[in-house]
From Swiss-Prot:
Catalytic reaction(s) noted: pseudouridine(1915) in 23S rRNA + S-adenosyl-L-methionine = N(3)-methylpseudouridine(1915) in 23S rRNA + S-adenosyl-L-homocysteine + H(+)
Catalytic activity, EC: 2.1.1.177
This protein's record includes keyword Cytoplasm: yes
Positions annotated to bind S-adenosyl-L-methionine: 73, 104, 123-128
Name this protein carries in UniProt: Ribosomal RNA large subunit methyltransferase H
Species of the source: Herminiimonas arsenicoxydans
Pfam families assigned to the protein according to its UniProt record, in alphabetical order: SPOUT_MTase
Family: Belongs to the RNA methyltransferase RlmH family.
Oligomeric and partner information: Homodimer.
Keyword vocabulary terms for this entry: Cytoplasm, Methyltransferase, rRNA processing, S-adenosyl-L-methionine, Transferase
Amino acid sequence: MQLVIAAVGHKMPAWIENGFGEYAKRMPPDCRIHLKEIKPVERSGSKTAETAMALERAKIEAAVPKGARIIALDEHGKDVTSVQLAQLLTQWQQDGRDVTFVIGGADGLDPDFKKKADMLIRISSLTLPHGMVRVMLAEQLYRAWSITQNHPYHRV
């Protein structure tokens, strides 16, 4: 199973890239995390947030591997604990479909894209920088994997 994080945004600071890379490299070969950066649509006076989200939607859809399960990160998504994420990871590994986590741009994700997603989850009730969400998601995926393996990284 391949885990993909499709994230709108590019040119992240080194500390974001290093943090993400640290957790991504800890994952086993059969459960690697791959990052697909999506260049955001430039905001200008003539473009509404809705227009920008629709244009980004097309780029996001192009980045999602065919047949992948889509998990959209959204502030109104379901709260998921680390243990629940581990249970989901186990289910996903058993069905063999790749999983793509989608992090939207500055205005969020297009409403039609969210309707199409297999699941909406949120990382936090707090508003976070999108780069930080990449790091936190990679850490939580590593934690979920460690829970499934009874690895000592996760302590209850």
